[in-house]
């Protein structure tokens, strides 16, 4: 879509003009008018549609052959819908009349050359590119929306390169093109027109920092044929007509949506009249396309697993073996980060979050590297970044981070409906402080990044009461065959005390926690009776329960949950330096691989040969068709304030729902 162009005609000599197919041209007949003119007639050769617009109140009418009263408010509108075969092969003739003269007072002739110009992309995400029915200057969300989609080309398809694909101005391998979006410039019209007219592809300096364009200028199977023409320091490019009527471009994103960047990028092509050597070229027509950079999307634990990651460290051989067996049962790949690479940093959940980006032509997994920068800090970039696996990170300029900036404090819910609004990709959950308080929060650059993705609007929970301060310490999600398709699990001191009281009433008060723990240092056992008589422990867990209850209400409101969607998992906490840590291995901090759950072995009281905590958890989860495997993480993880989820990570299958079909 382009603004109407005005062409002025003359009585002294014929005028020539270029018009674009389907675009209206206003013909100004008032600049040169014979004296005594009262009426005019206008005539066009076949293929030229002429309309008269009398005024704002009356709609336009076809000119036909009748005479029109000469009135300065009248507009003459000319439209051609097919490109010309030759220069000036169509024309419009205006004759000026007086009631006192039988013959026309004068004639004005406008010769027209029509050219069809369109800059197109995959406008409606399904491959249809009909520019007649959409405003390509807009990007519209929803199933009936339209607009192009651009991937941030943040993988590394050529293993011999040291940087990501979009970090330079070259195409290093042909596979790199699969991560780019195609943009096509089509022109139809007389070839001679382009002897003194030119086409310029251009963008703003702002957008040039966020996307770049390659023009195919040679054989498609040769990397050197892809010339970098826009992006970074280049904002305009005169397009040579190398392939006649169609020139193809490949576009890649450089930046994800973020603070100050909505994700929208515009490209324009302008036809310029360069026929006069004494003047600069003048614009005739501009066509525009708008791309939205695809957001980074998180995957909830209810989606099918594809690959499990775990670190091998000095004292976790049995743990790694147990995770490997669970991955085998779930039918997913296992990747073990060796100790030489992790340098005894086992918290792989905290180091990174595995998500994806998606366009109609390509889905690309992308790892989000946390700013925690422990000994694992090189693993995402050196080992996960590669062909068809992208990488992104955000770090504060002053590099000041807290424990909340680890990605055990970054989760996402399954799809939900809350307060009448659908969230088909779920909502991101991050931990912070209470509103108005001065406690710890996730660093601003990470929060800005998450909010800017738009498709999974974040919910901030209260975690500052926890020593580590991660949302995965008190909640998780598991798949379910009914209801909303999932259950939210919440750690519950109240449920644990209730369970222990029931066992005490049945005469099992002497049953011991922590029996059978294998550790370098002897772990002191404690009985149910001792737990239930410890007033400090009881009072502290009442406080913990109040903190979890606060989050429960926030989650019910923001995720649209009812009590039947929530399962309370028995759990106790203890205080360390006025913050909470798990009293026994934290049961909700589990690894979810489809129907297979890897749950921290709690070492709870043994009653009739069974751990009553394990038995209770099984009774809550197995009716959902889930299989519970309890993994001993006591020494290598629990004693270091982490559990199974903290020590593992999962790459999951993307949502079947396409993000561009939602309305944020």
Swiss-Prot record:
Disulfide bond entries: none
Where in or outside the cell?
Cytoplasm
Q: Which keywords are on file for this protein? A: Calcium, Cytoplasm, Disease variant, Hydrolase
**Reactions this protein catalyses:** L-arginyl-[protein] + H2O = L-citrullyl-[protein] + NH4(+)
Principal place where this protein is found? cytoplasm
Q: Name one GO molecular function term.
A: protein-arginine deiminase activity
Q: What is its EC number?
A: 3.5.3.15
Q: Give any Gene Ontology cellular component.
A: intracellular membrane-bounded organelle
Tissues and organs where the protein is expressed, per its UniProt entry: Hair follicles, and epidermis at very low levels.
Cite the Pfam families for this sequence.
PAD, PAD_M, PAD_N
**Keyword match Cytoplasm:** yes
Which branch of life, at top level?
A: Eukaryota
Report the cofactors.
Answer: Ca(2+)
Question: Family assignment?
Answer: Belongs to the protein arginine deiminase family.
Cited function = Catalyzes the deimination of arginine residues of proteins.
Disease field:
Uncombable hair syndrome 1: A form of uncombable hair syndrome, a condition characterized by scalp hair that is impossible to comb due to the haphazard arrangement of the hair bundles. A characteristic morphologic feature is a triangular to reniform to heart shape on cross-sections, and a groove, canal or flattening along the entire length of the hair. Most individuals are affected early in childhood and the hair takes on a spun-glass appearance with the hair becoming dry, curly, glossy, lighter in color, and progressively uncombable.
Q: What is this protein called?
A: Protein-arginine deiminase type-3
